[in-house]
Amino acid sequence: PPPHIRSHPVRARLRRMVQEATNSDAWGPHGQLLSKLADASVEGGEAHAQIVGVLGRRIDHARAHPEKWRNAYKSLLVIEYLTKHGSPRFVDEMRSRRYLSVLETLSKHFEFVDPKDLKDHGISVRNRAKSLVLLLRSSERIKEERGVARKNAGKYSSYSSRDAARDGQHWSPRRPERASHWDAEAAGAEGGAGAPQFGPKC
């Protein structure tokens, strides 16, 4: 079928994948799903826009409705994974002022205490966002983490809630991506691109 017919089911499938990875279930997104999202981000274009759009809407919705804190927390997990494993364009986008300001706001101001058991879930989101901001602000750390990801690309492990607590130390296999400045130490090349914004608020 023509591209304009094929593109709709592809967009819908990608949206479902990101929604599944950032849902409200008590366990983290599994490694195979994260690896598929990383592969899709490398395709660029519409795939990239769909991934960033759903992540943005999840975070915006959780900011407006803090009881959806798991959606925000798991969106941060996905952003971290794609920073380490996804496209160079995704990294450049997340490092832009637009996205860093959103993540910094989460790291400082996200609040939610469960009224049922008085457990503070806001601190989990703040700490995860703070960790992600530190990663995104460090070019050297990003290059180092992406180098580790390349070396471990043949290993497989599910990304469980325990993995999430350890910042995820095992990665799913994926195909090689085009080299960029973020992978310069491994590949000696330059690349990257810039950035649309997070999707509209829910």
Give each language-model segment a name.
Residues P1-C202:
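Alpha-helical scaffold domains
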